[in-house]
Every structure is written in structure tokens, then in C-alpha cells.
Amino acid sequence: MQNVRDWQWSQPAPQALGLVPMVVEQSGRGERAYDIYSRLLKERIVFMVGPVTDETANLVVAQMLFLESENPDKDIHLYINSPGGSVTAGLSIYDTMNFIKPSVSTLCIGQAASMGAFLLSAGAKGKRFALPNSRVMIHQPLGGFQGQASDFEIHAREILTLKRKLNELMAAHCGRPLEDLERDTDRDNFMNAAQALEYGLIDQVLENRAAV
């Protein structure tokens, strides 16, 4: 297996971030330049930035699978700054977090809303973090549909099934009764980092790196 220090896969930078800084490293074979996100991926840091889409999920899943192949016994760190997005895309990340051997630590930087909050809560127990001024928001799934009346009924059943499934999973991660999640996700429910800790969505608020 190739050593993690020698791999050359370039991580696609999160979209809409403008100019991406480059980092130049010296080695015995000369200089090598990385975009900053690829360099951080070498440290097993994966960024989930912006809306959760199929494209975002595919990139996050691919990076987690790659890091597992490099070292299946070392933690992966998922940094989340997301307003949420597609339920099915988010669940593909969630299932991969549970499928792979490494523990996945989660850290909220900025915001973790909707599916972002769900994935934040799904990190390995004891390894779910948020920075002091980050925001977390939970709510029920949103959806829209156009079509025949009979199709409306089918889609309504599906979204209700997803709602219950997400509430059951989050209740387990938060250590709370299902009834709490059903009540607290009925409308947009915003929390600061301390409130997210009290609710059970995270395990620790990180004031600085020394607190890890």
C-alpha cells in the first residue's frame, strides 16, 4: 500500500470559496504544491461545506473510503459547515461513516443545519465537537412535489417514513426519547454550541485546540 505521505490524489476544493490557497512542501524529491484542502486531506481532514448534494456526498464518501484504504485504524475528521440539503445524499454519507472501519470525528465550524446537524450528531461517540460560536439547527424534512393526486399520497408517505427514520436515528445519537425529537423537529429549532451540547448533538464545545 502506498504511504500516505506519497499519495498524489488532489481533493476537489469546496465550491464557491473563490481562490484556493496553495501550499508548497519540500521533500527529498524536490518541491510539491498542493491546494490547501488536498494538504489537509493528508491529515485525514475532510470538509463538508455548503449544501448537501449528490455531488458533495460523492466527494465526501470517496475521501472517506480513500482514507480507510490508507489507514483503517486512524480516525477521520469530518469538518461540517453546511445549511443541509438532500436527505438521500446525506444518508449516503451517514451509511459510509458507519460502514468504514475508522472512527469518524465530527466538528461543526460555522453552522450545521438540517442534514448537516444530523451528520454532526452521527460522529463517533465522544468525538462530536463544535466551535464556540457555531450554530446548529434541527427540523423535519422538507419536500415539494407536482403530479397526480395519487402520486401526492405516495410521496407524502415517503417523506413521513423518512421523517420518522431520521428522528429515530437522531434520538439514538442524542440519547433522547423519540418523542423529544418528534416535538423538537416540528419547526426550525436553532441552538448555539452550548445548547447543542446539552441536547446531546455533540460531546464537547472546543474553545481551543488544547481542549481536544
Swiss-Prot record:
A biological process term (GO) from this entry: protein quality control for misfolded or incompletely synthesized proteins
Main location: cytoplasm
The UniProt record lists the keyword Hydrolase: yes
GO molecular function: ATP-dependent peptidase activity; ATPase binding; serine-type endopeptidase activity
Reaction it catalyzes: Hydrolysis of proteins to small peptides in the presence of ATP and magnesium. alpha-casein is the usual test substrate. In the absence of ATP, only oligopeptides shorter than five residues are hydrolyzed (such as succinyl-Leu-Tyr-|-NHMec, and Leu-Tyr-Leu-|-Tyr-Trp, in which cleavage of the -Tyr-|-Leu- and -Tyr-|-Trp bonds also occurs)
Superkingdom in the source lineage: Bacteria
PROSITE patterns assigned to the protein according to its UniProt record, in alphabetical order: CLP_PROTEASE_HIS, CLP_PROTEASE_SER
UniProt keyword annotations, A-Z: Cytoplasm, Hydrolase, Protease, Serine protease
UniProt-annotated location(s): Cytoplasm
Active site: S114, H139
Function (record text): Cleaves peptides in various proteins in a process that requires ATP hydrolysis. Has a chymotrypsin-like activity. Plays a major role in the degradation of misfolded proteins.
Subunit structure: Fourteen ClpP subunits assemble into 2 heptameric rings which stack back to back to give a disk-like structure with a central cavity, resembling the structure of eukaryotic proteasomes.
Family per record: Belongs to the peptidase S14 family.
PANTHER family the record matches: ATP-DEPENDENT CLP PROTEASE PROTEOLYTIC SUBUNIT
Protein name as it appears in the record: ATP-dependent Clp protease proteolytic subunit
